[in-house]
């Protein structure tokens, strides 16, 4: 039988690995699902090349952005660029939002400049969640019109709230903002989805997912219990 020390060590490793999870871009489809390199700009370590990446349609008059956050709190910058390598010329597409609570976060209406319709580029999510800036990108075809999320899919976790929150570190990652006015003016963007969305009615693993911390803690307790038998 494994010693109590080895079992506890395995449990602590599980807790550490799970608690350090970052975030997952769910829509549009990300360039990579790998989270270990998310601190690498501009796209979380993924190879950004619009001629090679598989692109998802994103509607310039309004489309949804959905992600899963493994942190208790994080600020999100939604930005876009027509640079074929995602190397620069990033524009802010939505005011910076602070998410409080682990789980799903969905913004149902994100717009981009109308002149981008018919072009390819990248939509990027940059997060400031207390352990450095994290990045994820999606290759997209910017198309005309708008596209609401499929029914019931763009909802926030039951423990998630959101509000607009300035973040100078994230603001420094863009050259201009398509939805923000000039200095001193107010944004015309809609309020964050969390102020109006209803929590997911789906089971936790399908809707908001189980909290990383609670899952890990349960695993550690089971391991310790097994060692004491």
Curated annotation (Swiss-Prot):
One Pfam family from the record: BIM1-like_dom
Family: Belongs to the X325 family.
Biased composition range(s): Low complexity: 175-202
Record's function text: Lytic polysaccharide monooxygenase-like protein that has diverged to biological functions other than polysaccharide degradation since it does not perform oxidative cleavage of polysaccharides. Acts as a cell surface-bound protein that functions in the copper-accumulation pathway. May also act as the major cell wall sensor that regulates MAP kinase-dependent hyphal anastomosis, the fusion of hyphal cells.
Glycan-modified residues: 156
Amino-acid positions noted as binding Cu(2+) in the UniProt annotation, renumbered to this chain: 22, 71, 131
Chain positions covered by the region annotation Disordered: 173-202
Name of the protein in question: Lytic polysaccharide monooxygenase-like protein X325
Keyword tRNA-binding in record: no
